Amino acid sequence: MDIQHDLVIAHKYKIIQCIGSGTFGNVYKGVNVKTQDNIAIKMEDKRTSYKLLKRETSIMKYLYEHHCRNIPAVHWFGPVNDYMGLVIPFYECSLIQYRKIKSITLSKLNAIMTQCVSILESIHNNMVIHRDIKPQNFMVKQGELFLIDF
């Protein structure tokens, strides 16, 4: 996937660097040029994954609007040249990365698992099932967990 760095999306979101890649596309760290807030931009090929990314966006918006615990806000979703883009808040690291950089005590592990269960309970109460639960899909920001990749 060839996305130019410094590309500005929707006159607001600037791509800084690629921070991950997956089956259908890449995730970039970016910045909101108006507020200077860091954001994450998921870019996927329009031809192969439009429906999947649109579905993911719809689920995240639905859960966020229903006050589900720790679901990212969708800042923007739409076409970017031959790609579809999804802009959400930027998170420090995934739970798996967090485990590698932080020493996790038993009490901290208990708190993390309690947060995970609480997030899952919240989405299940809204009739949504996440089909890819794994540490890489729990993101950390200021010690709080967020579930991504619906």
Question: What are the functions of these language-model segments?
Answer:
Residues 26:
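Conserved N-lobe ATP-binding subsite of Hanks-type protein kinase domains
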Residues 124-140:
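Catalytic-loop of the protein kinase fold
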Residues 59-69:
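Structural motif at the C-terminus of the N-lobe alphaC helix and the adjacent alphaC-beta4 loop
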Residues 91-100:
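Structural motif in protein kinase domains
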Residues 112-113:
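Activation segment signature within eukaryotic-like protein kinase domains
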Residues 33-54:
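ATP-binding glycine-rich loop module of kinase domains
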Residues 73-84:
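Short beta-strand micro-motifs within the conserved protein kinase catalytic domain, predominantly
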